[in-house]
Amino acid sequence: MSGYQPPVVIDNGSGMIKAGLAGTREPQFVYPNILGRSKGHTADSRQELCVGDQAQERRSFLSISYPVERGLISSWGDMEIMWKHIYDYNLNLNASDGPVLVTEPALNPLADRQHISEVFFENLGVPAFYMSAQAVLALFAAGFTTGLVLNSGAGITQCVPIFEGYCLSHGVKQLNVAGSDLTSYLMMLLKGDGIMLLRTGDRKVVTDIKENACYVAMNYEDEMTKDSNLEKIYTLPDGKTVKLHKQLFHCPEALFSPYLVNVDAPGIDKMCFGSIMKCDTDLRNSFFSNIILSGGSTSFPGLDKRLIKDVAKLAPANTAVQVIAPPERKISVWMGGSILASLSAFQDMWITAAEFEEVGPNIVHQRCF
């Protein structure tokens, strides 16, 4: 929009919040989507608020809130504080300085979509607003407009079929197993082997092990029989070392076999297949040959090759199965938002404050698909 600052793009994740100005390749700010309040304050005292990494570091002294859980906003007041923090402390901008594009999960409840628009227009005072599905933006970032996006972050894993930029909601599948669950599972596996990393502060260490040492086995049963000489030595922050082996492929296996974390649901291979089979017959081959990975929990080495193998077993004979694993998939949702909000052809898509005032919050259902 002319006369304004470049649009702000906010990717609202269960684990991390990513924010920055459209037109840049990476978000300028990425930090945990958590809010901390000082304990023991009274109604008359000024309450100390910490967000992101600062809240993580001081969490033993704070009451911690997670504004987004399982992909959905669970505390609207805290979410608004996080959004205001982005403008006031990260970007040093007034919300009225320019448009904002906010991401949302597939199947976001209608009431939540309306509420988000109300907060940005009525409370923050943005001049223009748009909301876009995370999977659609990840697909755009990969250079496609049609494909099946497997998006897995901290809170949820979703399979989303997209045709020419439009989410086919009848084919969306969701699994409530994602990064946070895998971290908890790895803590349990380590405990079973006598490696006690169970304190709240240890979670960061276990997350680091998960992100830098875990991998997906091509064949889970075969991997179980391999020699322990495949052990990895991991150095803990206190200088002690631990030997890791089977935990490293046990952990991400829960994405393929959710029963490992006590969730009765199909794994990601069956999710992808089921999602595709919900779609029109003429579109299925396009989806089988364009499965796009997105989100940090799809970054395990070997996940893409294992997914090809397992989906191919389920697919009709002679079906070409291709999985595309963009190297930047941890931030691809935000990147897609940055690209979209910068396109000259997109500028007529913004919902303006005047339009919102005239039509009301229902306008998001008419304009944001």
From Swiss-Prot:
Disulfide pairings: none
CDD domains, sorted: ASKHA_NBD_actin_Arp-T1-3
Entry annotated with the keyword Kinase: no
Source species, domain of life: Eukaryota
Gene Ontology CC terms: cytoplasm; cytoskeleton; male germ cell nucleus
Keywords: Cytoplasm, Cytoskeleton, Nucleus
Gene3D superfamilies, per the entry: 3.30.420.40, Actin, Chain A, domain 4
Pfam families assigned: Actin
Cell compartments where the protein resides: Cytoplasm, Cytoskeleton; Cytoplasm; Nucleus
Tissues with expression: Testis specific (at protein level). Expressed specifically in haploid germ cells.
PANTHER family registered for this protein in UniProt: ACTIN
Assembly and oligomerization: Interacts with PFN3.
Family as reported in the entry's similarity comment: Belongs to the actin family.
Protein name: Actin-related protein T3
Organism for this UniProt entry: Mus musculus
Name of the encoding gene: Actrt3
